[in-house]
Amino acid sequence: NVKGCWNLGSCGMGCPTNAKQSMLVTTIPTALDRGATLLVETRVEKLVLQQGRVAALQCVAVAPNGRPLGGSTRIVAKHVVVAGGAINSPALLLRSGAPDPHRLLGARTFLHPVALSSAVFDHEVAGWQGAPQTIYSDHFLDVHPIDGPIGYKLEAPPLHPLIFTTSIGGFGREAAASFAQFPNTHALLALLRDGFHAESPGGRVKLRKDGSPELDYPLTPFVMDGARRALLSMAELQFAAGAKQVMTGHELAPIFTSWAQAKARIATLPMQPLLTKVVSAHVMGGCGMAADPA
């Protein structure tokens, strides 16, 4: 999925040369060549539903930052495909009053919550070079039954200065010292497999008073137990690979210099939201289409 790569290391922030074969340079040009009309800076506010069908789309003009500009457009089409992602798709259907007999619209929205761990080595890692995220491990997905304690996938992500500096903890000189070691820094992610246990039900998309979406996602003790085990696994792996320092994604974690130190301290960290760094790049669900409510 790459063509003419310049190896600039900015894949995760968007390719500056369009070598990454995104929709911008593949399917959208093809659609335009075949007669499609692309409306930019236009947002669908509501589907007009009549007799169980979409009769029209009510749209508004928006600025690049999403701020409404006041103009409106009404679109009538034979077929309508809702493809706004796991946040905006259920929000649109909720605003439109779409049929929801089981009251599941917006529910079971999953994130693969991610715990983070970075490590510093004596040698240069250059985590921004080469194809991104080529190594992963499913080992910890299979340690327990799928409906048992939450499992997790380990991935070695690419590094970018902006993503790295906004993801690690610390302030002032401590943070500056960590930034200075960026060339020798390696990172691991643990993606928690949510949605297979009653204590990991996922989140729910709701509407604010202005009709915009919000996601309520509970980071339950069950989920955070998985995050703790993931932090331990990642620190152990990094020290076994020769790391001289490990920085765990937790506000109260010091910089660890040995596996024994990390093992003892991570086991006692309070696994609470905001203290524990949790991120997500996989937003899924929210628009279940099965006839069975289960």
PLM region spans:
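Short beta-strand or tight-loop elements
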Residues: 40-42, 73, 285, 293-294
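FAD cofactor-binding and catalytic pocket of flavoenzymes
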Residues: 77, 102-238, 245, 264-266, ...
